[in-house]
Amino acid sequence: MLEKRLLRMGMRLQLLRDRRISSRGPGLHRAKADPQQQKRLTTGLMTQAETQKEAQQRQAAMRKTALWHTGHLQPKTHTHTGMHTQTHRERERNTQRLRDRERRENGRHTHRHTHTLTHTHTHRDTHTASYRRGIETHTTRQPLRLRGSAHDENDPRVREQPRGTQADLSSRSRMAARLLGRLTPTNTVRAGLRLGSRAASPDPAWGFLIVVGPL
């Protein structure tokens, strides 16, 4: 008898353990169902969920179609994903930018815009034009050449000139100094004449300036 009772209690505990039911009662949790029955229920629930999802998708498609026909919704003809939809304020801002750009292209600038563009444009163009004119018109600085120097001898332009011209200039300056010495025979003027004759150069004006200038 005792063995039978122990066997029954063991079977009962095993059954409770399989069903995960506390010895104090079933409690709030549901009993563990049969695996085959659970699989059948899961398949049925999945089928029902798929059916409901398809029905909701069809209803949403019908709503979109109705909105397209009434013009309240524009269809997405592009294939880009993740594009930002412009709001009404952004659309108005972009439209205003396009208007400003067209106004600038047509020449109807505002005062502020005209002042900025005119100043920058004039300033830059003036400097660029003057710089270009300076490059085109101004030649490189020529070195100072003295007659009778080494540079003068190597210069083809000077070599082409006859030496008789230089001799004529020096003789003319000496003749002018002699005439002035006869007109004003003073020691001071004679000293100036000597200095002028010594400093006689290809340009006769140098000796003349030394003679006439105040001593």
UniProtKB/Swiss-Prot annotation:
Superkingdom of this protein's organism: Eukaryota
Positions with biased composition (Basic and acidic residues): 87-108, 123-139, 149-162
Region annotated Disordered, chain positions: 74-172
Compositional bias annotation for Polar residues: 163-172
Compositionally skewed regions (Basic residues) per UniProt: 109-122
One of the Pfam families matching this protein, by short name: FAM27
Family classification: Belongs to the FAM27 family.
Protein name: Protein FAM27D1
